[in-house]
């Protein structure tokens, strides 16, 4: 087992990475202070790992209940969030009840948001079961739900007590979900660590084959990078925005097609292709680096051509973005691997990128 720490002073927490961790009682025990635990999971994950988690919690002598949500990005909304609150209230959960998010990014984001809101804040633990959630969404305290007009526009910054990333859970992940997680690994290397990006290029096939050593290194290094960024800028006042490379275009794709049509990581992968194209058009990135970026995204079996939503639709969707200010779209662009720029772009350049990268 490897442990990475997120250094946030008195709100610091560990990220435990390894195989077989869901069943390890001692990883949960230090973080559960009250008399009850509510597991939040979904209809796909509960049959796979719910019993193992409940068995791990049993020796603690806590009252354990489970809320099972429908699976998918399409359910990341108020109605599904209320299912969590319904369960907490029905079970008479109190301020010391610990929520445990068992699932991917949707479960983690919604459980964290519920924890932030219920009784104005109860503790929660992340147990991410997808590669995307292990390398990205479970770390850093971003929680929330989608709105029909924009992704993740309603939420809170609320840190977990711990992240327990069991890479053994990745063996049951569908291929599309695995690729979606590799997209976030690629993003992390591209924005923050050129050597890690080199490693990803050399090992993308090992990741595709789910080789445990490759997966463990990808999760570890991604978490190290994200932990350092979050420690420096917890509430996305500046530096943390670089983690949104590929997300301005990607969120527009998700909202434009309807949440769930493309996986989040698929949209981010294609969004990075689009951001790379725009980076070259603005004279920030060299063509050879753009080609390397596109090649590794394609090698991860991610889409590299965006849906043709129309220029006006893309622009409208990108203006409904957390980075936008006074309606001005902000992009995270590459200067070189490991170096980014947060900037606006002329509409003509954005239109040229859309013409080049959409079907």
From Swiss-Prot:
Needed co-factor(s): Co(2+); Zn(2+); NAD(+)
GO molecular-function term, one example from the UniProt record: metal ion binding
SUPFAM superfamilies in UniProt: Dehydroquinate synthase-like
CDD domains for this protein: DHQS (cd08195)
GO cellular component terms, A-Z: cytoplasm
EC assignment: 4.2.3.4
Record field: catalytic activity: 7-phospho-2-dehydro-3-deoxy-D-arabino-heptonate = 3-dehydroquinate + phosphate
Record-level GO BP terms: amino acid biosynthetic process; aromatic amino acid family biosynthetic process; chorismate biosynthetic process
Predominant subcellular localization, coarse grouping: cytoplasm
Residues annotated for Zn(2+) binding in this entry: 184, 247, 264
Chain's role: Catalyzes the conversion of 3-deoxy-D-arabino-heptulosonate 7-phosphate (DAHP) to dehydroquinate (DHQ).
Residues annotated to bind NAD(+): 71-76, 105-109, 129-130, 142, 151
Family: Belongs to the sugar phosphate cyclases superfamily. Dehydroquinate synthase family.
InterPro entries in alphabetical order: Dehydroquinate_synthase, DHQ_synth_AroB, DHQ_synth_fam, DHQS/DOIS_N, DHQS_C
Gene that this sequence comes from: aroB
Protein keywords: Amino-acid biosynthesis, Aromatic amino acid biosynthesis, Cobalt, Cytoplasm, Lyase, Metal-binding, NAD, Nucleotide-binding, Zinc
Bound cofactor: record note: Binds 1 divalent metal cation per subunit. Can use either Co(2+) or Zn(2+).
UniProt cross-references to NCBIfam families, sorted A to Z: aroB (TIGR01357)
Stated name of the protein: 3-dehydroquinate synthase
Subcellular compartments: Cytoplasm
Keyword Cytoplasm: yes
Pathway this chain belongs to: Metabolic intermediate biosynthesis; chorismate biosynthesis; chorismate from D-erythrose 4-phosphate and phosphoenolpyruvate: step 2/7
């Amino acid at each position: 087992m490897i442990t990475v720490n997120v250094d946030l002073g008195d709100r610091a927490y560990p990220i435990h990475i390894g195989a077989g961790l869901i069943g390890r009682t001692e990883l949960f025990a230090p973080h559960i202070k009250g008399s009850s635990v509510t597991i939040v999971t979904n209809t796909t994950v509960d049959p796979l790992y719910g019993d193992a988690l409940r068995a791990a919690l049993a020796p603690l002598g806590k009252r354990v209940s489970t809320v099972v949500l429908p699976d998918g990005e399409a359910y990341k909304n108020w109605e599904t969030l209320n299912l969590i609150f319904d369960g907490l209230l029905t079970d008479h959960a109190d301020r010391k009840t610990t929520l445990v998010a068992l699932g991917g990014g949707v479960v983690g984001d919604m459980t964290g948001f519920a924890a932030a809101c219920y009784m104005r804040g109860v503790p929660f633990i992340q147990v991410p079961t997808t590669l995307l959630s292990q390398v990205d969404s479970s770390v850093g305290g971003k929680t929330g739900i989608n709105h029909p007009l924009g992704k993740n526009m309603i939420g809170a910054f609320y840190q977990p007590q711990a992240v327990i990333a069991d890479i053994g859970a990745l063996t049951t992940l569908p291929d599309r979900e695995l690729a979606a997680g590799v997209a976030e690994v690629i993003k992390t290397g591209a924005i923050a660590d050129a050597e890690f990006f080199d490693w990803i290029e050399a090992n993308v096939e090992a990741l595709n084959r789910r080789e445990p050593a490759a997966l463990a290194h990808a999760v570890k290094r991604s978490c190290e990078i994200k932990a350092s960024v979050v420690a420096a800028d917890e509430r996305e006042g500046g530096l943390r925005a670089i983690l949104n490379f590929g997300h301005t275009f990607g969120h527009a794709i998700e909202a434009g097609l309807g949440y769930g049509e493309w996986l989040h990581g698929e949209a981010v992968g294609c969004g990075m292709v689009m951001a790379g194209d725009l980076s070259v058009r603005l004279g920030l990135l060299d063509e050879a680096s753009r080609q390397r970026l596109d090649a590794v995204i394609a090698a991860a079996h991610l889409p590299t051509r965006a849906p043709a939503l129309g220029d006006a639709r893309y622009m409208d969707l990108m203006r409904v973005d957390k980075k936008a200010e006074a309606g001005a779209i902000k992009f995270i662009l590459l200067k070189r691997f490991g170096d980014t720029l947060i900037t606006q772009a002329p509409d003509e350049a954005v239109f040229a990128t859309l013409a080049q990268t959409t079907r």
